[in-house]
Amino acid sequence: MLPAQKHTLETLLENSVKQVVQASKGDADAAFVLPAIALERPKVAAHGDVACNVALQLAKPLGANPRQLAERIVAALTAQPAAAGLVDAAEIAGPGFINLRLTPASKQAVIGAVFAQGRAFGASEREHGKRVLLEFVSANPTGPLHVGHGRQAALGDALANVLASQGYAVHREFYYNDAGVQIGNLAISTQARARGLKPGDAGWPEAAYNGEYIADIARDYLNGETVAASDGEPVTGKRDADDLEAIRKFAVAYLRREQDMDLKAFGVKFDQYYLESSLYTEGRVEKTVDALIAAGMTYEQEGALWLRTTDEGDDKDRVMRKTDGTYTYFVPDVAYHVTKWERGFTKVINIQGSDHHGTIARVRAGLQGLHIGIPKGYPDYVLHKMVTVMRDGQEVKISKRAGSYVTVRDLIEWSGGATPGSEVSPELLDEATITRGRDAVRFFLISRKADTEFVFDIDLALKQNDENPVYYVQYAHARICSVLNEWKSRYGATDALLPGADLSPLDSKQAMALMQKLAEYPDVLAHAANELAPHAVAFYLRELASEFHSFYNAERVLVDEEAPRTARIALLAATRQVLENGLAMLGVSAPSKM
C-alpha cells in the first residue's frame, strides 16, 4: 500500500488498540505503554494483504486470550468509518494474527499517485535539509580503475541517488591517494619505460607497474603531450627521462584524466576531488598529530609514535609515525575526516573494499581522541567484497591494458559487445555500445548485497533473454512502450485519457498483485536509504518486471471494450513510469525499444 494509506491504517489500528486497552484496564494504569503497530505483507498471498501481530503483543500484559483480543481489535477497527475505504475484510489467523484484505479501490489508488507524481513517484522529503557526504571510488592515481572500483562507483552513485530521493543534499566526493609509496612506484615505472626498458628487462624496477598503460604514459611524456584531470591544471611532458619529479607530475595527471574518462563512460560524476597531498601541503596532517599528542592520546615507544586506539575499542594500539618519520596509512585519513566534519558534514558515508575493515577502528579512534564533538561511529562505512570476472566459463584475471587486473573499461566494452582484447578509448566507441555495457555493468554490480562476493559473468551480460536481469527489466519497460504506442496508433488515443480512467475493471489477481507491487516502491526507496542498501532497488525492479509479465501474459490489454482496455493501459503506463524511476536510481537507461 502507499505510505499515506499505511499511515492511515496504522492510525486506525492504534485507535482500535486504545479502545480495547481502555475497556480492559480503564484508567487504572496510566503508565501502560501501547506496543508499536507493525504492518507486514504476508508471505502467502492467500493470507491477505496486510498482517499485524499487535494482539499477540498485548496478550501477556493484558492477561487476555490473543485471539479474543484480535477479534475485539478488528471489531473496533471496522467500526471506524475511515476504515471502509481501506479494509475490505479481516480475519483472525493462528494464535491471534490479524490479516486484512484491502479494498480494490485502495489498491488502484497507486495508479493515480504515479500519474500525479511522475518521475518524483517514490521520493520523499523526510530528510529535507540534511547534508550527507558520500565518498566512493577514491582510487590511487596509479593505474586504470579496476572492477573493485567499478563496484564502488556503481554502489556509490546509486546510493547517492537513493539518498537524494529522500531529501538529502548529497555531496559526492573522490579522495585521491596521491601521496605515498605507490606514487613513487608509478614515477619509477614510467621513467623505466621512458628509458626504453620493459618488464623482464635487466634494470626493470622490482616494484614497477607492468601494464601497457605505463608505456602509453612514457610515450606521451616524451612527446611533450599536455594532459589534465577534470579539476586539475594542465601538465606538459618535459621529454626528459631523468627528471623524476616531472615524470611523477605528468603520470599522476595522465592517470587522473584516464580515470575521469572511465567514470564518464560509467556515467558517474563527483562534486569534488580531494587530494591527499593537500593534507600535507596545508599542514593538516601535522596539525592533527599535534592535536592528538596534546590530548594525551599518543605515546612514544621504540622510536615510533603510537595512538591509544584501545581507548576507543580497538584490539591494540596502532603506530602513527614510524621510526623513519613517515606516517602510517590511517593518519592522513584521520586528518581528511576532520575536514569533512569542519565542512559541516555531520553525516558521512564511505564506500570501500572490505580490505579496509582494519582501518575503521583506527580512524574512528583518532577522531574521538581529538575531542572536537565528532560523534562515535563517525563516519559510516559500506564495505564491499571482491568481484570475479568470468568469460567462457573461465575466470578472467588480467587485461592487456592494466597488466594484472580487469579494468572498468574492459567490463563496459565487453558487456557492450566489443571484441575482448580490443583497445578502444571510450570516446571512440559508439554510444550504443557504451550504454549497453554501462547498463549491464551498473545493474549487475548493484544487484547483490555489497558484503557478498560477486561473480560478473560476461556471457550472461550479453544474453538477450530473461536470464539476464538487466535485460529482463529493460525489456519489460520496452514492451510496455510498444503496447502504449500501439494503443495510441490503433485507437487515436492520448495519455490525457489515463489520469481519469475508470480503474474498476482492474480486478484480476494479476492486476491486484501488480498494483500492490507498484505501491511498494516508496517503501523500497526508504529502506534502501535507511540501510544504505541500493541493491534493494535492483531486487525490487526484478520483482516488478516479473509481476508485469505475469499480468501481461494473463490478460489481453488491447481488447475491443473501451473501459477494460483503458484501465489496463493505465496500469501499464504507471508500471512503465515506476520501472523508469527505479532504473534511473541505479543509473541505468530505460529503453523504449529493444
From Swiss-Prot:
Q: Which reaction does it catalyse?
A: tRNA(Arg) + L-arginine + ATP = L-arginyl-tRNA(Arg) + AMP + diphosphate
Question: What is a GO molecular function of this protein?
Answer: ATP binding
Q: Which Gene3D superfamilies match?
A: Arginyl tRNA synthetase N-terminal domain, HUPs, Isoleucyl-tRNA Synthetase, Domain 1
- What is the annotated quaternary arrangement, including any partners? Monomer.
Q: What family does the database annotate?
A: Belongs to the class-I aminoacyl-tRNA synthetase family.
Q: List the protein's name.
A: Arginine--tRNA ligase
Q: Which gene encodes it?
A: argS
Matching entries from Pfam families are given as: Arg_tRNA_synt_N, DALR_1, tRNA-synt_1d
Single GO BP term = arginyl-tRNA aminoacylation
* Main subcellular location: cytoplasm
Q: Which SUPFAM superfamilies match?
A: Anticodon-binding domain of a subclass of class I aminoacyl-tRNA synthetases, Arginyl-tRNA synthetase (ArgRS), N-terminal 'additional' domain, Nucleotidylyl transferase
The record ties this protein, via InterPro entries, to:
aa-tRNA-synth_I_CS, Arg-tRNA-ligase, Arg-tRNA-synth_N, Arg-tRNA-synth_N_sf, ArgRS_core, DALR_anticod-bd, Rossmann-like_a/b/a_fold, tRNAsynth_Ia_anticodon-bd
Going by the UniProt record, its keywords in alphabetical order are: Aminoacyl-tRNA synthetase, ATP-binding, Cytoplasm, Ligase, Nucleotide-binding, Protein biosynthesis
